[in-house]
């Protein structure tokens, strides 16, 4: 089991932000379904990327890895071999996208994945696909992996719950490829910027769609994009961890985050706008974001535009000058972990004054102290706790941190290059007791 040992430290310097996971996975997906050959430059190398590559190879795509790019020749015909099984690994995007894609075929497709994926919701997407004519059969409980999908879906209208943007994104991709026309309405849409990112990809690939009402979208269907060339920019979600470390730094020098384009459609870029409103001294200069150590105020923060930033914002708010309420974050409960519970449990171990509420977190500023913590097998929890530990009094340890490779494989190396003091070591796997949180949650010391 990989464990971090973290001593108090501050960062400054200049680094390249790792490539965007969301763009990388969408680029691989669409290149594999395009006519001709596509080139993806600077893709993120991660377990999720590998899961997408292996799934697309099963469609018939030819994918060649080069030193800093992928060359992908799309499958010439949208057909599948019999009894195909797609392993989504631990990737929510591969899980949702291939569930929807499988529904356009007349061959049965089995979807499998890790035990972590088995707790992640899929029912709203399945119900929408069933309304289009797909059928599902389950090896265990309904709406849980593994299950089989049998299409093809046929033209019509449906509704899909918008509590997770990936449902609508997956449905939009299936409706673009299947024989249509199709239309659907997103009910109570959340995480809007991430669905907009999916629509941006459709626009770049000249795949037609229309929006008739605020949340209703229509698709002609039977679209096949042409091969393309795309360079993946930096991941604003990953950059958030470096940004908070830079804001809390005691160094007199700024931190330069390269490879961040503020014109990118990634949802989490709005987090940097929020940080400025809270008092952060941030300068945007071409594709570089310059972050100076700053004093941050708390406040009422709507998390919906950047839901993945909840753990690291919770850490930042512990060091703010006033209380904070992170709200509209119900979706954070259904990520790799229940992030509302997970970040509360672990920060309370450090002495944080933090409590969950019905859709988010209440946080009063408080000093943090070194502690032994657990990642909950969630990359964003592990990275957020790492930044918290850098600014705590005393040393800390975080166990089960292999999950960080999901989005930020060189996270520790980059932090240490900026003068952090973090060591990695392997310890024997043991039965780690995480508890239910009942002994901690609600015991806020303030």
From Swiss-Prot:
Phosphoenolpyruvate binds at residues 21, 92, 120, 166, 339, 380, 406. It catalyses: 3-phosphoshikimate + phosphoenolpyruvate = 5-O-(1-carboxyvinyl)-3-phosphoshikimate + phosphate. GO terms for molecular function: 3-phosphoshikimate 1-carboxyvinyltransferase activity. Its main location: cytoplasm. 3-phosphoshikimate binds at residues 21-22, 26, 165-166, 308, 335. PROSITE patterns: EPSP_SYNTHASE_2 (PS00885). Pfam families: EPSP_synthase. Its EC number is 2.5.1.19. InterPro entries: Enolpyruvate_Tfrase_dom, Enolpyruvate_Tfrase_sf, EPSP_synthase, EPSP_synthase_CS, RNA3'P_cycl/enolpyr_Trfase_a/b. Keywords: Amino-acid biosynthesis, Aromatic amino acid biosynthesis, Cytoplasm, Transferase. GO terms for biological process: amino acid biosynthetic process; aromatic amino acid family biosynthetic process; chorismate biosynthetic process. Pathway: Metabolic intermediate biosynthesis; chorismate biosynthesis; chorismate from D-erythrose 4-phosphate and phosphoenolpyruvate: step 6/7. It is found in: Cytoplasm. GO terms for cellular component: cytoplasm. Gene3D superfamilies: Enolpyruvate transferase domain. Signal peptide: none annotated. It is an enzyme of class 2 (transferase). The active site is at 308 (proton acceptor). Catalyzes the transfer of the enolpyruvyl moiety of phosphoenolpyruvate (PEP) to the 5-hydroxyl of shikimate-3-phosphate (S3P) to produce enolpyruvyl shikimate-3-phosphate and inorganic phosphate. Belongs to the EPSP synthase family. Monomer. This is 3-phosphoshikimate 1-carboxyvinyltransferase.
């Amino acid at each position: 089991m990989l464990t971090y040992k973290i001593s108090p430290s501050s960062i400054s310097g200049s680094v390249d932000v790792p490539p965007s996971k969301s763009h990388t996975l969408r680029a691989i997906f669409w290149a594999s379904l395009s006519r001709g050959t596509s080139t993806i430059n600077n893709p993120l190398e991660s377990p999720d990327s590998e899961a997408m590559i292996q799934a697309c190879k099963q469609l018939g795509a030819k994918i060649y890895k080069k030193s800093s790019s992928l060359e992908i020749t799309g499958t010439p015909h949208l057909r599948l071999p019999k009894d195909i099984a797609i392993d989504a690994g631990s990737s929510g995007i591969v899980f949702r996208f291939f569930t929807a894609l499988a529904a356009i075929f007349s061959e049965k497709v089995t979807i499998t994945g890790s035990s972590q994926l088995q707790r992640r919701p899929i029912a709203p997407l399945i119900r929408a696909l069933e309304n289009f004519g797909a059928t599902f059969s389950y090896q265990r409980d309904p709406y849980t992996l593994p299950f089989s999908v049998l299409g093809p879906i046929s033209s019509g209208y449906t509704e899909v719950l918008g509590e997770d943007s990936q449902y609508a994104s997956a449905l939009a991709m299936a409706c673009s490829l299947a024989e249509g026309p199709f239309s659907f309405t997103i009910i109570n849409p959340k995480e809007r910027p991430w669905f907009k990112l999916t629509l941006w990809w459709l626009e770049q690939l000249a795949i037609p769609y229309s929006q008739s009402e605020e949340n209703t979208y229509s698709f002609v269907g039977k679209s096949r994009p042409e091969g393309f060339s795309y360079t993946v920019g930096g991941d604003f979600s990953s950059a958030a961890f470096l940004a908070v470390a830079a804001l809390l730094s005691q160094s007199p020098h700024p931190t330069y985050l390269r490879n961040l384009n503020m014109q990118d459609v990634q949802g989490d870029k709005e987090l940097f706008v929020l940080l400025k409103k809270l008092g952060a001294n941030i300068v945007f200069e071409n594709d570089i974001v310059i972050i100076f150590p700053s004093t941050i105020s708390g406040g009422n923060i709507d998390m919906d535009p950047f839901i993945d930033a909840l753990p690291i914002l919770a850490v930042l708010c512990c060091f703010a000058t006033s209380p904070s309420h992170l709200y509209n974050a119900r979706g954070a409960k259904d990520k790799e972990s229940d992030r509302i519970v997970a970040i509360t449990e672990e920060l309370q171990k450090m002495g944080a004054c933090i409590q969950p509420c019905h859709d988010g977190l209440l946080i009063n500023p408080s000093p943090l102290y070194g502690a032994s913590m657990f990642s909950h097998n969630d990359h964003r929890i592990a990275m957020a706790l790492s930044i918290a530990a850098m600014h705590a009094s005393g040393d800390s340890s975080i166990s089960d941190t292999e999950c960080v490779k999901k989005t930020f494989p060189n996270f520790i190396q980059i932090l240490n290059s900026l003068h952090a003091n973090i060591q990695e070591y392997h310890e024997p796997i043991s039965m780690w007791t995480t508890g239910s949180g009942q002994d901690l949650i609600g015991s806020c010391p303030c």
